[in-house]
Amino acid sequence: MKFFVDTADVAAIRELNDLGMVDGVTTNPSLILKSGRDILEVTKEICDIVEGPVSAEVVASKAGDMIREGEHLVKIAPNITVKVPLTWDGLRACKVLSSQGHKVNVTLCFSAAQAILAAKAGATFISPFIGRLDDINFDGMELIAQIREIYDNYDFQTQILAASIRSVNHITDAARIGADVITAPPAVIKAMANHVLTDKGLEQFNADWAKTGQKIV
């Protein structure tokens, strides 16, 4: 499974990347706003840090304008993936941009039917939003399972990029189902290292070591 980090926080990306935890990055207008920086400037800096795909999202609503924005975004760096919404215009833009050889991430997917359309339009990634489905009492993981089954049945090459990740369980459940990629906030990725029994065991080891009166260095 590939790990993408869902943030425009350059310091957080650099920290995880230095540990080999980052295979790519996803951004969106909300994350750019949170960063307080110019979209082109911060996206270029992220692309310089991370070798893998960096999703930069268009903001237009019409296909022609999305295509123009996408063609501008891909000039930032070779590893840019153009992110488009799962609307009819977004699918039209996806088809054109993918036909031009650009990577496309189709985002805001909430149904298997939408995922089929994205694959047919040539999407590199499909981003089903797990947490937002859970918020309205739908099973986000069931959607991942449905898309996995359909894509495997018909050998679609579009990668399932599980998004709207809210917890460590979301990550492990998506991994078990077979999502190709997860994108999660830095805090959730770092939380994967935490376990109460690890803390308890370390506390005991440290207490016992103190009783030996020894030093390693």
Curated annotation (Swiss-Prot):
InterPro entries the UniProt entry points to: Aldolase_TIM (IPR013785), TAL/FSA (IPR001585), Transaldolase_3B (IPR022999), Transaldolase_3B/F6P_aldolase (IPR004731), Transaldolase_AS (IPR018225), TSA/FSA_arc/bac (IPR033919)
GO cellular component terms given for this protein: cytoplasm
Cross-referenced Pfam families: TAL_FSA
Cell compartment(s), UniProt: Cytoplasm
Covalent S-S links between cysteines: none
E.C. no: 2.2.1.2
Pathway in which this enzyme or protein is active: Carbohydrate degradation; pentose phosphate pathway; D-glyceraldehyde 3-phosphate and beta-D-fructose 6-phosphate from D-ribose 5-phosphate and D-xylulose 5-phosphate (non-oxidative stage): step 2/3
Keywords, sorted A to Z: Cytoplasm, Pentose shunt, Schiff base, Transferase
Listed Gene3D superfamilies: Aldolase class I
HAMAP family membership: Transaldolase_3b
Similarity annotation: Belongs to the transaldolase family. Type 3B subfamily.
Designated name of the protein: Probable transaldolase
Organism: Paracoccus denitrificans (strain Pd 1222)
Taxonomic placement: Bacteria, Pseudomonadati, Pseudomonadota, Alphaproteobacteria, Rhodobacterales
